[in-house]
Amino acid sequence: MSWLTLGELIHTTLVFATAIIFASLGGVFSEKSGVTNLGLEGLMVFGAFAAGVGGFYAEQAGLGGTSAAWVGVLSAAVFGILVSLIHAVASITFKADQVISGIVINFLAAGSTLYMVKLLFEGDGDTGRIQGFNEISIPFLVDIPIAGKAFFQAYPTTYLAILLVIIGYLTSYKTPFGLRLRSVGEHPGAADTVGIKVNRLRYIGVMISGALAGIGGATITLTTTNMFSHNTVSGQGYIAIAAMIFGKWNPLGAFGAAVFFGFSQAIRNYVQLFAWSQSIPQEIIFMLPYLLTIIVLVAAVGRSRAPAALGQLYDPSKR
């Protein structure tokens, strides 16, 4: 492998990892508050849909490609928050099973977005192509061998994802809000005793996860596919759940795991360049990221400690 190819491999890894970074970071906030969120896949699908529709109509209204793409990102975040409220109301207010509620979000996304896109685009199964984001090249730095192509020529969403990981870590471990959020996920009864509004913070955690997972879905639409269709997300939300668990519910850990899974998808593309790969069925090569997800989850069992009150319903009147 040449140095040029190595730089391109790292670059492609970050492209694939970005959506997983957003969604896994969102999952961390929800589950740190004690609310299991298996609906990341559905939230990403809704975000990808909102970004495709928002970006398309923004371009039709005369906005430039980048401006229209940011409209798509904003639309995805808002849509993600609204959909996450369904999960929050069901699991926090009405005490529904959190696992089932998250799965319902996934099924709802699969059916409703396909219906809505056909309704809005005259029976077509996609939004039509949009310009989306262009990569940003940082002058001079992009010319550095290997590192230039790898780190200094990227989509705006990649830089945003890295920034939010840093902010997410500092918020979780260095601020009063983060301490309160983690306390309601570890021991909600004790948190309630000292005056912390448990359910309010859990709502906030779920809404943050909705916004970030929605942006994760938007990232795929606006950088990789440049349109929305029913298979745009293709299981990235489930990989994000694995990244969250493998990263031990820590923003930095989730980031590292997301990059690992992004690498597994990037290497899938490069494996096909080698002659020996021609003897391997293409289906097996395309299964690689998902096989690694299963292997990582099995390896993480017993090694990752989830928040103590994760998945536990809390009723303030019964404390």
PLM features: residue spans?
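Helix-loop-helix "hairpin" substructures at the membrane interface of multi-pass membrane proteins
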Residues: A150-F228, P251-L252, G256
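Membrane-interfacial amphipathic/re-entrant helices at transmembrane-helix boundaries
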Residues: M1-S24, T36, A50, E59-V71
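Cytosolic-side transmembrane-helix boundaries in multi-pass membrane proteins
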Residues: E186-R200, V271-R319
